[in-house]
Amino acid sequence: NLYQFKNMIHCTVPNRPWWHFANYGCYCGRGGKGTPVDDLDRCCQIHDKCYDEAEKISGCWPYIKTYTYESCQGTLTCKDGGKCAASVCDCDRVAANCFARATYNDKNYNIDFNARCQ
């Protein structure tokens, strides 16, 4: 779920507040459209598509589905918990790791969505 995703982000990117990822580029935090503005925004686009796939599992609601995972020194490991939970956890784990690898560009935070995300 989104609360657990926030915690995963904090694990992989501990020096940046999670809310900096909630309104970034064209895909982080609000659905999304257009071309991602950079690699970090592309991480969010991939995460959105991953959630779309998880929603195809009967009864799976990624934004609220809880799952079990472990975090140890920046390493995230999803635990068994059924097909939906495993799928959602993996979406969040992959995205949090992607965030850690991508460069955060302050100019892409809180951009003019209508002008830049066509």
Swiss-Prot record:
First-tier enzyme category under EC: hydrolase
Catalytic activity: a 1,2-diacyl-sn-glycero-3-phosphocholine + H2O = a 1-acyl-sn-glycero-3-phosphocholine + a fatty acid + H(+)
Tissue specificity as recorded in UniProt: Expressed by the venom gland.
Disulfides per UniProt: C11-C72, C26-C117, C28-C44, C43-C98, C50-C91, C60-C84, C78-C89
Single GO biological process annotation from the record: lipid catabolic process
InterPro entries: PLipase_A2, PLipase_A2_Asp_AS, PLipase_A2_dom, PLipase_A2_dom_sf, PLipase_A2_His_AS
Keywords associated with the record: Calcium, Disulfide bond, Hydrolase, Lipid degradation, Lipid metabolism, Metal-binding, Secreted
Active site: H47, D92
Any GO MF annotation of the entry: calcium-dependent phospholipase A2 activity
Location, primary (coarse class): secreted
UniProt cofactor note: Binds 1 Ca(2+) ion.
Cellular compartments annotated: Secreted
Cellular component annotations (GO), alphabetically ordered: extracellular region
Any Pfam family hit: Phospholip_A2_1
Family: Belongs to the phospholipase A2 family. Group I subfamily. D49 sub-subfamily.
Cited function: PLA2 catalyzes the calcium-dependent hydrolysis of the 2-acyl groups in 3-sn-phosphoglycerides.
Record-given protein name: Basic phospholipase A2 1
Species whose genome carries this gene: Naja melanoleuca
